[in-house]
């Protein structure tokens, strides 16, 4: 491991300790940051990296760390600042200039490439927490108690973001951002249909597996121009809140805002394996029998082959809990090393195969990998998707 990587790990650990001493973190969260310091990868800029570099106070970094604990997407997703206050405009090449075979004394006509501008909008995701003043006063560490109460609201932010990243459709919900599924919604009749692979499911319990190569030049998250990692926290102070019966009580409020979006600069760097029949997968029968041409292991290999260059960014598979579980089981059944479960990376012990190192209770587990590409879990990937054709 390079010296710079060691220094980054030490710095991240020190940040956790400093935030703990300032009262911004409870001990459990601080320990997660110290453990998480061992997980950094050079060459990729995720939301936490941006937050740490742009907000020296540590407040935004703390929020991002909490988001990162319960959303595996943020672990690898690369982010960049949009070039618009409300989104990001990308110029996409739609055609190449023509070339001709020239003869002697024959002129060459001028030619140019064709380009199109695509604007990806950013959505504003908000939530607020209200904690009874007396409940706060009962706890010695008031700020830590408020932060712990706010974690449920941050989890709501997490789930909404993950759901929108895959299924957001601005034609139906204009206040959100455009997700991946509407962009990769057809196998035939669309230019990017070559990157939509069917697993053969025809019932009502279908899901999708996604392969995404994160990079500012391929696919990445965006946040508004001039903002700090898109996440804001405002302490609303003490005010009158209302219960279910519209009766007043004094509360301490917090407002959380996450301005975020998604831009696809090059559609070739995402592949959707759709129509994965969950019943067949669990039973290892039908479309998901080991001998079937539509078995997900075979289709994941095909998905990787559709990517022009796996080194163009950070490649990651995303699947729901059931799919990831079956891949972990396959890793134990197979003698070859196509699928593997990485061992724990430090002395804190192991949890169930497929768990994300550094999350949960502060102990580290293995990461499921397919041909070296990590497989991340996302519970927001539905198991009742409509059949894609």
Please provide the spans of the model-predicted regions:
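Primarily extracytoplasmic ectodomains and periplasmic/lumenal surface modules that are beta-strand-rich
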Residues: 96-99
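Core alpha/beta structural scaffold of self-assembling particle/tube/pore-forming proteins
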Residues: 38-67, 71-75, 87-91, 101, ...
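Active-site-surrounding "flap" and adjacent substrate/cofactor-binding loops of secreted or lumenal enzymes
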Residues: 106-110
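Intrinsically disordered, low-complexity terminal tails
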Residues: 1-49, 383-389
């Amino acid at each position: 491991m390079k010296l710079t990587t060691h220094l980054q790990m030490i710095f991240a650990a020190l940040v956790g300790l400093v935030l703990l001493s300032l009262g911004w973190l409870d001990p459990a969260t601080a320990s997660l940051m110290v453990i998480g310091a061992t997980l950094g990868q050079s060459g990729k800029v995720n939301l936490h990296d941006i937050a740490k570099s742009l907000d020296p106070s540590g407040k935004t970094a703390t929020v991002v760390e909490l988001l990162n604990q319960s959303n595996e997407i943020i672990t690898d997703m690369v982010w960049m600042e949009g070039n618009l206050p409300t989104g990001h405009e990308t110029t996409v090449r739609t055609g190449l200039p023509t070339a001709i075979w020239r003869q002697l004394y024959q002129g060459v006509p001028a030619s140019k490439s064709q380009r199109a501008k695509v604007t990806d909008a950013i959505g504003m995701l908000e939530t607020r927490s209200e904690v009874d003043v007396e409940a706060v006063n009962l706890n010695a560490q008031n700020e830590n108690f408020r932060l712990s109460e706010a974690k449920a609201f941050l989890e709501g932010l997490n789930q909404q973001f993950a759901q929108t990243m895959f299924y957001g459709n601005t034609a139906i919900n204009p206040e959100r951002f455009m997700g991946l599924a509407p962009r990769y919604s057809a196998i035939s009749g669309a230019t990017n249909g070559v990157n939509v692979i069917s697993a053969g499911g025809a019932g009502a319990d279908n899901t999708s597996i996604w392969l995404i190569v994160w990079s500012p030049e391929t696919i990445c998250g965006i946040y508004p121009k001039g903002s700090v990692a898109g996440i804001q926290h405002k302490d609303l102070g003490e005010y009158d809140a209302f219960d279910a019966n519209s009766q007043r009580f004094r509360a301490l409020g917090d407002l959380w805002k996450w301005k975020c979006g998604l831009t696809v600069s090059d559609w070739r760097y995402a592949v959707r394996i759709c129509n994965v029949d969950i019943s067949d997968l669990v039973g290892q029968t039908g479309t998901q029998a080991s001998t079937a041409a539509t078995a997900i292991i075979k289709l994941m290999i095909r998905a990787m082959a559709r990517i022009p260059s796996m080194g163009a960014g950070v490649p990651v598979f995303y699947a729901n809990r059931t799919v990831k579980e079956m891949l972990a089981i396959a890793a134990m059944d197979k003698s070859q090393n196509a699928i593997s479960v990485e061992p724990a990376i430090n002395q804190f012990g192991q949890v169930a195969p497929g768990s994300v190192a550094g999350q949960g209770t502060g102990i580290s587990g293995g990461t499921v990998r397919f041909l070296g590409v990590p497989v991340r879990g996302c519970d927001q990937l539905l198991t009742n998707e409509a059949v894609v054709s």
